[in-house]
């Protein structure tokens, strides 16, 4: 069971705001003594931003994404941390189809994980039965990308 809210508001002919929110109470419906939580299903997810620009000239955006904490196993005894990432973009569109764009990903260099799992694994020197532990894909650190593109 859940609800989603998606909207976009045009403040000016060259500027818009958008916000997407989702809430869910994700559970397995059949009884299981292990638990009824769905691993990896966050209760809250949000994304939004401000975008500006016209067909030519300056353009840009500031965008944010949030994933709430989520159960990593069915009994909800192990949970992930929430994550919050902000990205920025600025550039210039020329009337000849050229575009110069600068992207700053993970603008605030958030030390968070893109995704987390919890399962048995075995590294050298660990017990033969393995060790239950978190397995993560960390968010990429702050990165800057410059793009020069042409449309023809």
Predicted segments, located by residue:
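C-terminal beta-signal and adjacent terminal beta-strands/loops
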Residues: 92-152
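Glycine-rich loops and low-complexity Gly/Arg-rich segments
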Residues: 17, 42-45, 75, 84-90, ...
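Residues that define the transmembrane beta-barrel architecture of outer-membrane proteins
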Residues: 1, 40-46, 82-86, 140-144
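Flexible, active-site-adjacent loop/turn segments at secondary-structure boundaries
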Residues: 26, 36, 70, 83, ...
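Short, glycine/charged-rich beta-strand-loop motifs at protein surfaces that mediate ligand recognition
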Residues: 73-79, 87-91, 105, 134
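Gram-negative outer-membrane beta-barrel transporters
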Residues: 1-73, 149-151
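Flexible, surface-exposed loop regions and adjacent strand-edge segments
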Residues: 33-41, 67-68, 77-82, 116-125
